[in-house]
Amino acid sequence: MRLVLLGPPGSGKGTQATRLKDTFEIPHISTGDLLRAEVAAGSPLGLKAKEVMARGDLVSDDILLGMLEARLGQADVAKGFILDGYPRNVAQANALCALLSKIGQPLDAVVQLDVASELLVERIAGRAKAEGREDDNPESVRKRLQVYTDSTAPVIGFYEQRGKLTRVDGVGSLDEVLERIRKALGR
């Protein structure tokens, strides 16, 4: 199973990716985790990323794709993977499609977790309050959700046009959402 998990901040995609990893016994690949690991390891890509981040810039698609290509070349992805946090825009979706074609590992499915914006604001604000993060006020959360909507809506369309997208209701208990994802994937 080769799967991309999409969803706005607060939709539970990281939590569900971890649960799916255990269910399907395939690795959960988070581009954020990859980036931190490469920087910590001091790899050539990690050094490039560190330099970019030190300037306060976003890490380029090329650097992220290089890290992802290296990760997808590891033995533990032979049975599949769950990709979380990538792609975030259509250029990344095209690059991922080309990479997976090159390595003979096309995607099986893309799951979009749907959760209403107001519930996302409540979830993130509640989580931020519990963690003592005062910068996650409802207005800043709404702005982050708008950025997600603006950049990711075209990605959803990209996969929808290719017949890969499945939308899943992300509201409910962890078990209920996991069961919906499993059913949507035919598992």
UniProtKB/Swiss-Prot annotation:
Binding of AMP, residues: 31, 36, 57-59, 85-88, 92, 133, 144
Region annotation (NMP) ranges: 30-59
GO biological process: AMP salvage
Region (LID): 126-136
Main location, first listed in the record: cytoplasm
Top EC category: transferase
Pathway membership: Purine metabolism; AMP biosynthesis via salvage pathway; AMP from ADP: step 1/1
Keyword entries, A-Z: ATP-binding, Cytoplasm, Kinase, Nucleotide biosynthesis, Nucleotide-binding, Transferase
Annotated EC: 2.7.4.3
InterPro entries, per database record: Adenylat/UMP-CMP_kin, Adenylat_kinase_CS, P-loop_NTPase
Localization of this protein: Cytoplasm
Catalytic activity: AMP + ATP = 2 ADP
Stated family: Belongs to the adenylate kinase family.
Name of the protein: Adenylate kinase
